C-alpha cells in the first residue's frame, strides 16, 4: 500500500496483505484482504506507531525509511503486542539501536516472552502508564490503558495537538485499503468486532467512557481505513455492539446445518413463510459459510432460528461449532427458535437447548419444529405455529 498523508506531520506507513487466506488462521479475508496499519509522527522527535506482521516486514521497513528521509526515529510506540502488529518490532529495533520502545509494563512482559529476555536492554524500554504523556515537540501523546480490548497490554494513544486517537485494534475492519477503499465501514467492522473483540464488551465500554471526554477528529486503527468522517456513527456502533444489542431487533437469522438437504429445505421454507409476513430474514448455510459471517449476522439480528440435523446422536458439527463461537463471543439477550431433524431419533433440539443454556438471557420459543427426514403435515403445522410466535412480538 502506498504511503498516505494523515496530516502534515503524520503519515500512514502500513501494508496491505491481499494474499492471506485466514485471519488468525480461522476467519476468511478473501477476497477483501487485510491491512496492517502503522503510522509515523514527524516532529522534533519522531515516533513510529506500531509495527506490522512479519509477512510484511520488508515493505513496512521501506515505507518507514521513505518517510524518514534520512532521519532516525526516536520512539517505537507499541499499543498492541499481537504478532500481526509486533511481528516486525525487533527488525526496526535492530535497524535503529538508539530508538526507544514505548509501552506499558505488560507490553514489556510480552516482548520478553516473544523475543527473549535479552531482546531489549532496560535502557531502551520507556514504560508509560495511564495518563502518561510523551512530548515529540509540537505533538504530544497521552496514553490510555485499555486492557482486554482485546489483549491485556493494549493501550490507546491520543495525540493532543491534532486530536487523533491511535486506537489499537478498536475501530478496526477487515479489508485491505487498496481493495476496500470505497466500501462502507460498518459491514466488515461489525464482522471484525464480533469475532475478534466481541467477548470483551465491558472493556470496550470502559474504552468508550475514557475517550468520551476527548475531542477526536481522526481515529487511526491498526486495521482498516483511517477514520475522519462519520466518527459519531462509528462510536454509536461500538456502543451498541459492546452491549450485545441487536441492530435490527425484528430481523431474523435462520442458521441451518443440513447433511443431505432436508434440514436446509425446512429452513428455506420457514424463510418464505416469514417473508410473506413482511419479516426481514437472513439465512445462513453453516456447512459452507465462513463462521465469522454467521456470527456477525446472529448479533445483528434480534431473533435467531437454529435448524440442525442430528448426527451420530449428537449435533451436526457445523451447528455445534457455530454455537460454540456464539458462546465464546458473549451471545445473549436474544429470542431463539429451534428446528431439529433426524431420520430415526431427532435429538438436535435438546442438544441445541443445552448449548444455549450456557449463554445469558436466551429465551426459547415454545414451538419446536421436529422433522423425521422431511417436512410433513405435522411438522408444517409446527412451523406455522413457530411463525406465529416469531411474528407475535
Could you describe each region identified by the protein language model?
Residues 88, 290-294:
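Short acidic active-site motifs
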Residues 44, 55-102:
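Active-site metal-binding motif and surrounding structural segment of the metallo-beta-lactamase
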Residues 49-51, 73-81, 100-104, 165-168, ...:
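Active-site neighborhood of phospho(di)ester-bond hydrolases with catalytic His/Asp-centered motifs
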Residues 40, 156-192, 197-220, 229-256:
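Metal-dependent phosphodiesterase/nuclease catalytic metal-binding core
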Residues 4-8, 102-154, 200-208:
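Metallo-beta-lactamase
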Residues 3-66, 156-159, 163-167, 263:
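Conserved beta-strand hairpin/beta-sheet module of binuclear metal-dependent hydrolase folds
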Residues 255-277:
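Short, charged N-terminal beta->alpha structural module
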Residues 177-219, 223-226, 269-284, 294-393:
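FMN-binding flavodoxin-like domain, especially the glycine-rich phosphate-binding loop
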